[in-house]
Amino acid sequence: HNMFLEGTLLKPNMVTAGQGCPKKYTPEDIARATVTALNRTVPAAVAGITFLSGGQSEEDATINLNAINQFPGRKPWPLTFSYGRALQASVLKAWGGKDEL
């Protein structure tokens, strides 16, 4: 398809268990599954990976991204985040819609 991979940023979710899954996986489990999936599918030429929070809390998304970055496996792309709601939720809750200055 004549894609310029070196100019491409990929915005995936992390590999996490579904909402109905009763087992709680560790950040290390999530890191292993995520890095494995990326290595199997994403060309090394891709310019970078910017993770979405995928419905995780701000704390879980941050802990899991740290585990992914610390994971010793091959990661030929820069890894960062593109969180929206995960970083806004606690701020919006604290604000609560009040019109104070």
UniProtKB/Swiss-Prot annotation:
UniProt key word Lyase: yes
Listed EC numbers: 4.1.2.13
Catalytic activities: beta-D-fructose 1,6-bisphosphate = D-glyceraldehyde 3-phosphate + dihydroxyacetone phosphate
Residues forming the catalytic site: K11 (schiff-base intermediate with dihydroxyacetone-p)
GO molecular function, one term: fructose-bisphosphate aldolase activity
Gene3D superfamilies, per database record: Aldolase class I
Database matches in InterPro entries: Aldolase_I_AS, Aldolase_TIM, FBA_I
Protein name: Fructose-bisphosphate aldolase
Species assigned in the record: Lymnaea stagnalis
